[in-house]
């Protein structure tokens, strides 16, 4: 995984400020240590984080880990279970804990 422990903690902390019960996954190229570059792809499974909170969440994450390209998907558990793209992502994703 090409995300430092400190970055992972900061991301998780920022998301959990909005929903303590959420699950946060890193997916995409940052999961593979052999690949270079790439943005930070995050999947958040939350019943509380809505569309309006997503922008403020991105701003907060960038404040904590620095300006980086971040793709943020936020889905409810039901949406995630019904979405084949999300199911594909989760097969290789790493959950931040």
Question: Residue locations for each model-derived region?
Answer:
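Catalytic core of pol beta-like nucleotidyltransferases
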Residues: 1-23, 31-37, 46-97
